[in-house]
Amino acid sequence: MALQFFSCKPKYTFLSSLLLLLLLSSSVAELSFNFYAGSCPGAELIVRNTVRSASSSDPSVLGKLLRLIFHDCFVQGCDGSVLIRGNGTERSDPGNASLGGFAVIESVKNILEIFCPGTVSCADILVLAARDAVEALGGPVVPIPTGRRDGRVSMAANVRPNIIDTDFTVDKMINIFSSKGLSVHDLVVLSGAHTIGAAHCNTFNSRFKLDPKGNLELIDASLDNSYAQTLVNKCSSSLDPTTTVVDNDPETSSTFDNQYYKNLLAHKGLFQTDSALMEDDRTRKIVEILANDQESFFDRWTESFLKMSLMGVRVGEEGEIRRSCSAVN
């Protein structure tokens, strides 16, 4: 019998996550939930503590870590290739120019290299750090199998065809997700990452403008007028739109919750891609369910985040354990 994605009270548990793991590729089968139990038993605790410590001095780093995992996994899989520095690498692509959180990953790696040299991959660190960032903001704890190896290839040319731009249509987003083995449900659920984090004004200010008299003029009619006015005020013409940031979620920006979906119902999605989810029946119905049931969102997030974290993983000779996350060995 096929599993139903939504029910009145979904009960996705550790067992369902394990079942999902077993159904995926043979490479994934080489991962395990206790991969470092013998070789580096404190690995996950070190990741968690370092993330918490970094966020105490810079709370914005949590949203940055979550965004970072999307930009890694969607471009040739969760292999840590987005972390590599250098001309022509993924990290050098303009589409990744605003990424952050790299220093936290390097801090974790430096500590682990002291206690467990050459053991824990940067790919695993990145996935665990994103998982812990969500937990630190009140989100669900996602069981993550580890044992990923680090990729040796990082090419800027691979970035643009694989990441979603803020003006994409639902069809374009579905096509990219489908190419990664992710469903429409995964698209809507993982878009919930926008319940935290912030965005630069130039990523959404094409949705409105001021007329010659200084009055607001909506270019995107799907945007709530009062919310658009708030965005205009925060993205004043006197400020640099490439450096000025606005919270993705205007209501509960420091909490991982289902407020993002409630915002969409009120036509207060920051990006065109957010608002687009309300314009298509395939996605709108899922938004409505998640907006009304945070438990359902957390259950769905656990499943979809796990699926994303298993995309294109490297194991064995397919990769390496980098000594530094910013460079191949």
From Swiss-Prot:
**Which keywords does UniProt give here?**
Calcium, Disulfide bond, Glycoprotein, Heme, Hydrogen peroxide, Iron, Metal-binding, Oxidoreductase, Peroxidase, Secreted, Signal
The EC number on file is 1.11.1.7
Q: Where is this site: Transition state stabilizer?
A: 67
What does the UniProt cofactor note say? Binds 1 heme b (iron(II)-protoporphyrin IX) group per subunit.
**Gene name as annotated:** PER18
List the Gene Ontology MF annotations in alphabetical order: heme binding; lactoperoxidase activity; metal ion binding
- The residues the record assigns to binding Ca(2+) 1 are 72, 75, 77, 79, 81
- Species of origin: Arabidopsis thaliana (Mouse-ear cress)
Protein name per its UniProtKB record? Peroxidase 18
